[in-house]
Amino acid sequence: MPVVYVNIFLAFIVSLTGLLIYRSHLMSSLLCLEGMMLSLFVMLTVTVLNNHFTLANMAPIILLVFAACEAALGLSLLVMVSNTYGTDYVQNLNLLQC
């Protein structure tokens, strides 16, 4: 396995670990999700370019579009929670809370 793949995989693992550890604030969770999506995008792009997958050339762009939509929805949720509760705690997103 080349060093590039190992580095990208480690970036994904670090982002996943950050998501599991720092899950109290919504902003830190969103940043970790963006790190995961970025590492997946780079891994997919490197794989497509190295293996000359001509049919999968659009896959990294589609993943990037989904990442942008996820970021926009996450930021709108962050603004809504911040305006409603005054903080960005993830526990405020619990729908069973009254």
Swiss-Prot record:
Any GO BP annotation: ATP synthesis coupled electron transport
InterPro entries: NADH_UbQ_OxRdtase_chain4L/K, NUOK/Mnh_C1-like
Reaction(s) catalysed (UniProt annotation): a ubiquinone + NADH + 5 H(+)(in) = a ubiquinol + NAD(+) + 4 H(+)(out)
Single GO MF descriptor: NADH dehydrogenase (ubiquinone) activity
EC numbers, comma separated: 7.1.1.2
Alphabetical keyword list: Electron transport, Membrane, Mitochondrion, Mitochondrion inner membrane, NAD, Respiratory chain, Translocase, Transmembrane, Transmembrane helix, Transport, Ubiquinone
Compartment(s) of residence: Mitochondrion inner membrane
Pfam families given in the database record: Oxidored_q2
GO (cellular component) term, any one: respiratory chain complex I
Lineage: superkingdom: Eukaryota
TM region positions: 1-21, 29-49, 61-81
Membrane topology per record: Multi-pass membrane protein
Family classification: Belongs to the complex I subunit 4L family.
Protein role: Core subunit of the mitochondrial membrane respiratory chain NADH dehydrogenase (Complex I) which catalyzes electron transfer from NADH through the respiratory chain, using ubiquinone as an electron acceptor. Part of the enzyme membrane arm which is embedded in the lipid bilayer and involved in proton translocation.
Quaternary structure annotation from Swiss-Prot or TrEMBL: Core subunit of respiratory chain NADH dehydrogenase (Complex I) which is composed of 45 different subunits.
UniProt name for this protein: NADH-ubiquinone oxidoreductase chain 4L
Gene: MT-ND4L
